[in-house]
Structures are given as C-alpha cells and as structure tokens.
Amino acid sequence: MAVQQYGVLKGIVLDMKRETDDDSPHFQVKMLGEENTYYRCAINVMSSSEESEVLYLADDQFDSGSITILPNMPYGYTRINEANREVALDYVRGNLFDPREMKPLPHEITGPDNDLNDFIETYMKKAQDEKTPVYIFGSKFGPEQAADKIFGFTPTNGMHNIHMNQGNAMDTRWKKDNGSWHDGGILIQFADQWAAVFLAFLSQSWCTDENGNPVRDCDHTQTSA
C-alpha cells in the first residue's frame, strides 16, 4: 500500500526541538517551505518495537543523480509519483549507500555527540546557520486549522515517515506502510557539498519484493551495497 502523500519538502530550517521522553520521541524541526507556509518535520529517533534503537547513517559527501534535479524544485512540498520517480528514495534498490555502514543509536543518553538527537541536531543547526536548502523525504500531513502542537504556527503542516518505509513484518500494524521507492530521508544542500541522513528501524527486513514487503528476515548487514 505504501505511505500516503509521499513526497519531498524543500525548505529552510527555522527552529528545532528534541524530545527525550521514552514513549515515542521525535526530533522536531520547523521549516519554511513556500512563502509564509510553515512545516513541522517529525523525525523518529526511537522505534516503537522491542528493538528501540534506530539505525543511522550520515554521509557528508553524498552524491546521487537526484541532486542534479532537486535544486530546480520550488520551495515547499512536491508530491512524488511515477512522473518524477527519479527523485524518490529506495534504501534497497537505489544504491544510495552501503547499508552495512548503518549504526544503531539510542535516542538520548548523557554526554555530547553520542546519541541520535545529538547527531541530527548538529546537521540541522549547521543548515539553519547557513540558511541552506534542506530536503525532507517522507509523507505529508495537513493542513489542519489547529495550531501546531510543537511550534504553535497555523495551519499545521508537516512531514513524517522520514525513514525507511519497507520491510515491515506482515503481522504488524506498519505493514501498510510498505512500498518500494517510498523511503524517507534528509538531504542538505550545503554550499560546497551535499550531506545525507538515512534512518531505519532494526525490526525492518532489507530483503523486500517490488511492493516493499519482506520476502525473508535479513538485516542491514546481510545485504550488499
């Protein structure tokens, strides 16, 4: 079925907030997309499954064919479909990175630069300071007339599912999110290079069919680049 409203948000980082609770924490980012249109990007930093740590990979010298297309996109949300699938992300099929290089990280532990909140915050603060374009891949929610629950702007718009969206077990409620070429992620267009952040859950299989459903159990270390 795949996640709904899959697309990419191009915007500028305005603010951020880290959540440290142990229920369903997110790293929250406020972004300006289209003129006078704000978005909240909810980045998962902990899994709801028994394996709570999230797999993380950052590439400070990211290179992909899509980065020649993205700068020409207008600011704001662009839905991705068959007509522009060349910009879609697929962790299994897209040859974006070597999955074996992903590392599991806790969402919040004492000390600097040692948990997922710390690493995401570092990239977002740099992007904010440099006012550089950030591309958030995932699924859109809103607009909703109620004020945003984190940043208070109206109407509420945002992006979520900013992580791998395939390989979820068929006996879980997340199976409906499975799809190929529907993965989330973060690309940042710095002045002299591109950076990328990719996130996945330990419970997801990396051996999937064309519908994103798992064909067998295999983790990120059991697949080739």
UniProtKB/Swiss-Prot annotation:
This is Uncharacterized protein YukJ. It comes from Bacillus subtilis (strain 168).
